[in-house]
Curated annotation (Swiss-Prot):
It comes from Methanobrevibacter smithii (strain ATCC 35061 / DSM 861 / OCM 144 / PS). Pfam families: SRP19. Part of the signal recognition particle protein translocation system, which is composed of SRP and FtsY. Archaeal SRP consists of a 7S RNA molecule of 300 nucleotides and two protein subunits: SRP54 and SRP19. Belongs to the SRP19 family. The gene is srp19. GO terms for biological process: SRP-dependent cotranslational protein targeting to membrane, signal sequence recognition. GO terms for cellular component: signal recognition particle. Involved in targeting and insertion of nascent membrane proteins into the cytoplasmic membrane. Binds directly to 7S RNA and mediates binding of the 54 kDa subunit of the SRP. Keywords: Cytoplasm, Ribonucleoprotein, RNA-binding, Signal recognition particle. This is Signal recognition particle 19 kDa protein.
Length: 89
């Protein structure tokens, strides 16, 4: 299982604040629903936990998604981010 926090894909955050992908492929303020759409289009099984808080922002309930994948985490995050760019256009 790979944990995907919306912060990993957020263009507005720095690497120190939690972004894991490059700014070129990151998206502005990704929502859980958008990430779910991207995962459906990628045909990846997942489960959503909406009441979870990102450790760096424990006061915000941003939620997280657990994805079943054998791919390395960064490769998966890049795929999700690119799919999010398609969805948001």
């Amino acid at each position: 299982m790979i944990t995907v926090w919306p912060q990993y894909l957020d263009k507005n955050l720095s690497l120190n604040e939690g972004r894991k992908v490059s700014k070129e492929i990151a998206v502005e303020e990704p929502k859980l629903q958008d990430i779910e759409k991207a995962l459906k289009r990628l045909n990846l099984p997942y489960s959503t936990q909406k009441e979870r808080s990102y450790p760096g922002k424990w006061y915000e309930k941003s939620g997280r998604i657990l994805v079943e994948s054998d791919k390395p985490k960064l490769e998966l995050l890049k795929e999700i981010s690119l799919k999010l760019q398609e969805i948001k256009q």
